[in-house]
Swiss-Prot record:
It is linked to Smith-McCort dysplasia 2: A rare autosomal recessive osteochondrodysplasia with skeletal features identical to those of Dyggve-Melchior-Clausen syndrome, but with normal intelligence and no microcephaly. It is characterized by short limbs and trunk with barrel-shaped chest. The radiographic phenotype includes platyspondyly, generalized abnormalities of the epiphyses and metaphyses, and a distinctive lacy appearance of the iliac crest. The gene is RAB33B. It comes from Homo sapiens (Human). This is Ras-related protein Rab-33B. GO terms for cellular component: endosome; Golgi apparatus; Golgi lumen; Golgi membrane; phagophore assembly site membrane; presynapse. Changing K35A: Loss of interaction with ATG16L1. No change in prenylation activity. Loss of interaction with ATG12-ATG5-ATG16L1 complex and colocalization to phagophore.
């Protein structure tokens, strides 16, 4: 696990390409890189969440992800520059088969996403957790549960207390947010910055033990959905 939790390193050059010091040129500063994968059914808003965090806005156009979508953003935490790489994979099985092994390689953290207006996407979460296990992701890799599209209040199907019980059962923090609503921009920021702080410090995201009366979900058939975000 120690090797898995070690971040990647990349050279970060100054505008002159190096830093001068008393003994001549010093080696270029290096930034840690953390790979975070974003998992969930198609149409739950994975791409829009990663775009909102990296670009600071909702994408002008949204289309179904085919294969893997990759974005990154540099942040500074306690004076250290860190790069966060967000890997968003297609939720549809036929688009995932050729990429799944590469997708799960050297992962530092996982974000599970469901659509708050679609109960089926919530019931699919156990299958996504199982996929992580099948690809040998250690249990102590940080995980976060995200309910997206909270702005569609009249259409919400997944109550917060149900999602919270599931999150507690799997020792994950729960965030409910909207990638589309600008008012929730700080909340989207908090999701990924929570992971960034955790990865930098290697401290647990949750210290409490999951309750004994946790719920267990079984996958249900996924209905057709029209929103590609």
């Amino acid at each position: 696990m120690a090797e898995e939790m070690e971040s990647s390193l990349e050279a970060s050059f100054s505008s002159s390409g190096a830093v001068s010091g008393a003994s001549g040129f010093l080696p270029p500063a290096r930034s840690r890189i953390f790979k975070i994968i974003v998992i969930g059914d198609s149409n739950v808003g994975k791409t829009c969440l990663t775009y909102r965090f990296c670009a600071g806005r909702f994408p002008d156009r949204t289309e179904a992800t085919i294969g893997v979508d990759f974005r990154e953003r540099a942040v500074e935490i306690d004076g250290e520059r860190i790069k966060i790489q967000l890997w968003d994979t297609a939720g549809q099985e036929r688009f995932r088969k050729s990429m799944v092994q590469h997708y799960y390689r050297n992962v530092h953290a996982v974000v599970f996403v469901y659509d708050m207006t679609n109960m089926a996407s919530f019931h699919s979460l156990p299958s996504w957790i199982e996929e992580c296990k099948q690809h040998l992701l250690a249990n102590d890799i940080p995980r976060i549960l995200v309910g997206n599209k909270c702005d569609l209040r009249s259409a919400i199907q997944v109550p917060t207390d149900l999602a919270q019980k599931f999150a507690d059962t799997h020792s994950m923090p729960l965030f409910e947010t909207s990638a589309k609503n600008p008012n929730d921009n700080d909340h989207v920021e908090a999701i990924f910055m929570t992971l960034a702080h955790k990865l930098k410090s290697h401290k647990p995201l949750m210290l409490s033990q999951p309750p004994d009366n946790g719920i267990i979900l079984k996958p249900e058939p996924k209905p057709a959905m029209t929103c590609w975000c």
